[in-house]
């Protein structure tokens, strides 16, 4: 599936500086020829290799529920990965992350478009909820709230306001509580 949306972008124009223009952003599933671009994207966005190593390990171990990329003029400018996450009673849900957007393309809504597209695909697939460890001032824009309010704790020692959950199916969510455990790839790579 391809989702095409329009986004504002600052485009350099010789002699005029940067102009705000509407450009088509394509959101699609990752393809094998995107792997190198995604690795470079992670390195540039995070300033290190750890997140790229996690993405590579998840992909290599078949632990990806959904992997979307955002492209601008056929160039990968963002990506989002969802992987399985288990809750105490053998319940599997989706963990969002890593997600990255090229530094020069940030603050243009690309990350938001990736989150919205990915969350909708998971909702359509019947996923009860999505967990994220992320910025407390960013993810609530998309409906994420502290997971502790639903009786779910993170296996890692992280502040309550950065361990968040987005409910996709309230009926399936009612009986769920416990300790959320990420896949081993998140703690076994550096």
Q: Model-derived features: where do they sit?
A:
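Conserved active-site alpha-helix within GNAT-family acetyltransferase domains
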Residues: 124-128, 133-159
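Conserved beta-strand in the GNAT
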Residues: 67-69, 75-85, 92-100
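Short hydrophobic/aromatic beta-strand or adjacent loop that forms the aromatic wall/cage
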Residues: 65, 161-164
